[in-house]
Amino acid sequence: AEASKDRIRVELLNYKRLLPGTKILCNIQAIHPLALVVSMCDQMLGHIPVTSVSEKLTERLQNALDQDDEDDEEEDEEDEDEEDGPPELPDIFSVGQWVRASVESVTSIGSKRQWGMGREGGEYERESQRVQLTMEPRIVNEGIRADDLSEGYLLSATVQSREDYGYSLDLGVSDDVHGFIPTKEILRVGAVLLVQV
């Protein structure tokens, strides 16, 4: 009788138990122009809008919109360098890539799912809309202190800027803690990476 008291019952994760603020590891299933469709455990789907990827990406998108408004007035100017424009989601992510996310909202199902049907067409998209997630490192890494960071620690980071021998990263931990990744590989400013200290 006493052994049963020491046991902890682990519940399967489902849409009803998924609460805002829950941190979850996701796998990218589809990449759309304005959102990522991700798979979570227990065959649940969610979506990450382009504005919930990182603050830096959102800032670059807003600047591009503002620039487009100005360019409409001045058509004769030369095209900007491709690197100056915001990256598109397929440039940053790939299907099958693992990402960390935090639940922003969960909506109840609008219509009953018809059993026997696969996740084809609109149903797949509709089901992914039930859970809205964010990848912003300041939200996903919430609760992590600078003291917690030690060798081997895994966390999300945003590519802030290109440096001479790599890229500076915003870890979203605190204003005075930043990262650096030495690489010759080309990364896009605003991209979110899963990095290890």
Residue spans of the language-model regions?
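Single-stranded RNA-binding regions, centering on S1/OB-family and related RNA-binding modules
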Residues: 1-197
